[in-house]
C-alpha cells in the first residue's frame, strides 16, 4: 500500500495549524461536493479530502500519521505495507497499521483457547441528502491476518453490499455481525462496525435534528418584505421574508430538517443582509433621502446596555 500525503491533498504544510487546515478542508469540501461541483471525479476527490481531514483534525491521529510519514521509507514499513498492487493507504487502515509498526505486543506463540476475532471499524461518508431515505452502499475493507507474533502478515480485501438506513446521524455505529477478523481456534468472528460520517454540506449546517442555511437578502427585501427561493434537501421552496426583518434573524421552515425514526427536524433560514456595491451619485442620493426620512432612528441607542 502507498501512504497518502494528506497534507498535499489538503494543500497545506505539515507545520500549519488546525485552523489553517480546517479552512482548506471547508474550501475543498465546497469545491468538490458532488451536488455542486461539475469537475470530473468530484466525488472521489471529496472522499479523499474527507479522509485527510479525518486524520489531520485529530491531534493524536495527526501525530501518529506524522510519525508514520517519517518512517515511510524504513524497511519494516515497506516490507509490511507497500504491496505491489499499488493499493493506497487510507484512514480505515490507520489504527491497525500504526499499532502494527509502532507498538503492538507480540502474541504468545503457545496454543491459546478459542478466542473471538477482532472487531473492525471503518468510516462511511454519507451525504446529507442520502440520510432522507434508505440506500445501498458497496464498501471495501481489508481483513488483517496476524502471524504467531501478533504482527500483520497480510491483508485480505473484502467487499460487502450493505444498507444504510434512513435517518442515520453523524457518529452513529452500524454493526455487521461476524464480518470482522476470524476467531482463533474455533472462536467466533469479530464484527464490522460502520461509523457514519455526515459529510459537510456547502449550504447547510447541522444543529441536532435541525438544519440551518444562511440566506442572503438585500436591505430593501429585509425592510419591505419579499419572497425568495431557498433550497432544501429535497426541493426548493418559496420563503416569505417579513417586513422589518433583521440581520441574523432565524425563520423556521417546519419539517424540512433531518429525518429520524422519532422525529423530523426543521430548517432555519438565517438572514444575512448584503449591501449593494459602492453607490453611484444617484443611488447615494436615494440613500441620503432615506437617512433624512429616518433621522430619528439610532441603531446604537441600546448599544452596550444590559
Curated annotation (Swiss-Prot):
Naturally occurring in which organism (per UniProt): Shigella dysenteriae serotype 1 (strain Sd197)
Pfam families for this protein: DnaJ (PF00226), DnaJ_C (PF01556)
NCBIfam families (UniProt xref): PRK10266.1
Domain of life from the UniProt record: Bacteria
PROSITE patterns (alphabetical): DNAJ_1, DNAJ_2
Gene field: cbpA
Subcellular localization(s) per the UniProt record: Cytoplasm, Nucleoid
GO molecular function, one term: bent DNA binding
Name of this protein: Curved DNA-binding protein
CDD domains for this protein: DnaJ, DnaJ_C
Role: DNA-binding protein that preferentially recognizes a curved DNA sequence. It is probably a functional analog of DnaJ; displays overlapping activities with DnaJ, but functions under different conditions, probably acting as a molecular chaperone in an adaptive response to environmental stresses other than heat shock. Lacks autonomous chaperone activity; binds native substrates and targets them for recognition by DnaK. Its activity is inhibited by the binding of CbpM.
GO cellular component annotations of the record: cytoplasm; nucleoid
Domain J residue range list: 5-69
Keywords from the named record: Chaperone, Cytoplasm, DNA-binding
Cross-referenced InterPro entries: DNA-bd_curved-DNA (IPR023859), DnaJ_C (IPR002939), DnaJ_domain (IPR001623), DnaJ_domain_CS (IPR018253), HSP40/DnaJ_pept-bd (IPR008971), J_dom_sf (IPR036869)
GO terms classed as biological process: chaperone cofactor-dependent protein refolding; protein refolding
